[in-house]
């Protein structure tokens, strides 16, 4: 990536305003056209949203978009839409025991509504605040209950200089919808559900009325994700490149031993599915921000503040560095996988801008939108800690990506197209994405998580331009 060092949030304000304008049109169009009996809109097919996939994991993005739009513009109809749809459709997601997506669905809806109340953006009604907080407490506990232990109890750290016997034990994880053998990179963003519930004073009650600490479980999951889904250039396997991310880790459930990396949606276990890496970048960066609110003694049982912080920071930086240096195009947008079957046909992608209309492999703008927010948050975090050089590098990388996404050919101004952020990919190996006539790879379509994270990114930049900030907690 060629990072633009001169960009500022203020310089992107015209672009973010355009994002909010177009997002409003798309939100209203989808609400008017979508029949909830069809399930949840997931991605577009020939410009129209359709449902597809395993679970209703994108419904929180659909309604969360309305809250984000209200936050950015003050448009009361969007607040009304978000409130009404959340009350009507989201309760089943709060108690859903079969998914790893509580952060996506519930933090995007109940979490955004609570944040707006606490920020004073809307009138504080205690009943509404209590309702959102109860939903978030239950969501965090239900998500935490989807847990299995590993065989690993010894402390571990990706930081080479860590003294022996210190670190965080990768001793368990929240398993994916593939089953208890499966740990997804994506799930790091659902750790928001656990830590928000913890912040609200909640615990998961287990057998014999034993309380289970939700913060500790979130840290445990994060450590296991870092240990097995992220690579640190330490010779773990023949393809161990620092910052590489495997979408999935597979464990033997009889003994808890790690067996192999895998990939549900990427090209292979030994390349990087770029959206999976984006979840790591964003997820670990925002958890670092949350750690600053936690008392040191509350982390002692999982290795201590220094060990947890070092693990989170090295994981985030490794994934960010590989994004910038390893597989991003010059303009900050990655292809869907770092080295898919036909990637060699593209030449050196790091030396030129991404081409969503190429004939070999699709780009994934949604990966860029997710990662950009992580870059901004990590950059802000490091700068506040006095690490200004690294902080500025990541922060400017985030702005560089945003500048690219918030313009053609990625931002959709076509009123006939229901999507906002074009050229995203859902599941390339399964062939789920639309390939236009005369082309060889998917392009020109949007997805609900891409649209949501584009608006979330624009809102963060809008706040930064005004000298403000926001977090999920």
Regions found by a protein language model. Give the residues of each.
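Glycan-recognition and catalytic cores of secretory/periplasmic carbohydrate-active enzymes
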Residues: 1-473
């Amino acid at each position: 990536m060629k990072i633009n060092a001169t960009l500022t949030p203020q310089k992107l304000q015209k672009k973010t305003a355009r994002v909010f304008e177009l997002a409003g049109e798309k939100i209203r169009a989808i609400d008017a056209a979508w029949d909830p009996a069809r399930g949840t809109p997931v991605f577009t097919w020939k410009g129209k949203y359709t449902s597809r996939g395993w679970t209703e994991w994108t419904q929180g993005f659909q309604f969360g978009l309305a809250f984000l739009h209200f936050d950015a513009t003050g448009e009361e109809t969007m607040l009304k839409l978000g409130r009404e749809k959340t009350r009507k459709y989201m309760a089943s997601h709060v108690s859903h025991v079969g998914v790893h997506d509580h952060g996506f669905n519930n933090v995007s809806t109940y979490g955004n509504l609570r944040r707006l109340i606490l920020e004073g953006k809307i009138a504080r009604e205690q009943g509404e605040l209590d309702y959102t907080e109860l939903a978030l407490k239950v969501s965090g506990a239900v998500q935490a209950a989807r847990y299995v232990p590993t065989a690993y109890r010894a402390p571990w750290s990706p930081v080479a200089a860590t003294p022996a016997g210190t670190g965080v034990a990768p001793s368990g994880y929240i398993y994916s919808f593939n089953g208890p053998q499966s740990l997804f990179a994506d799930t790091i963003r659902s750790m928001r559900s656990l830590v928000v519930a913890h912040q609200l004073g909640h615990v998961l009650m287990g057998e014999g009325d034993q309380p289970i600490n939700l913060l500790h479980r979130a840290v445990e999951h994060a450590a296991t994700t870092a240990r097995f889904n992220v690579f640190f250039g330490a010779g773990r396997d023949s393809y161990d490149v620092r910052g590489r991310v495997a979408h999935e880790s597979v464990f033997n459930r009889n003994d808890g031993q790690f067996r192999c990396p895998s990939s549900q949606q990427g090209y292979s276990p030994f390349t990087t599915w770029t959206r999976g890496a984006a979840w790591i970048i964003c997820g670990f960066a925002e958890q670092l921000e949350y750690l600053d609110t936690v008392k040191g003694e509350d982390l002692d049982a999982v290795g201590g503040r220094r060990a947890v912080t070092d693990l989170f920071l090295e994981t985030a930086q490794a994934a960010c560095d590989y994004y910038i240096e390893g597989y991003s195009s010059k303009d900050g947008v990655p292809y869907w996988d770092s080295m898919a079957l036909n990637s060699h046909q593209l030449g050196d992608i790091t030396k030129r801008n991404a081409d969503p209309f190429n004939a070999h492999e699709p780009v994934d703008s949604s990966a860029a939108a997710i990662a950009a927010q992580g870059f901004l948050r990590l950059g802000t975090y490091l700068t506040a800690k006095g690490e200004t050089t690294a902080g500025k590098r990541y922060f400017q990388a985030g702005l560089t990506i945003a500048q690219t996404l918030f313009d053609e050919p990625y931002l959709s101004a076509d009123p006939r197209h229901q999507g906002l952020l074009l050229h995203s990919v859902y599941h390339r190996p399964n062939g789920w994405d639309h390939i236009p006539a005369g082309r060889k790879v998917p392009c020109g379509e949007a997805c609900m998580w891409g649209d949501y994270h584009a608006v979330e990114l624009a809102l963060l930049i809008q706040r930064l331009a005004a000298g403000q900030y926001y977090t999920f907690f």
